[in-house]
Amino acid sequence: MKAFAYTTSSSEPRIGIETPEGRFNFTQIWRYFKEYKNFRQAPDLPFLQLMVELDYFSKDTFIEVMDTVKSFRSLNVLRLDNDYTIQVPIARPAKIICLGRNYAAHAKEWRSEVPEKPMFFAKLSSSLLAHKGVVEFPKG
């Protein structure tokens, strides 16, 4: 099971969930779950970041919500077609800490030895790019 952020053809943000059965609109599945459980005070969840901030982002949450909604309605109408765009999972991270340069291909590319231990490095939060996003290079 994989969660992802996406926008609809009308640029509305959503959370998607990928299961062996396909990709689904988790934002709408969450709404059905809230209604079924009578969680009227629970917020809508259009962003993965909001799920993280509210401490709802866990495998157990996704499983419980999906299993509950599947028990009373078909998810087929919530299956995603090709009319959506994958977005960055967290749009405004405070920090990006990376783990890398510990595999052979990268070390060879940089003409260096493969480190014995993984290396950590930081990236600017503006370095995130959506799937198939365009990298813009500065002019000049």
Indicate where each model-derived feature is located.
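N-terminal non-catalytic cap/leader segment that marks the start of a structured domain
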Residues: 1-118
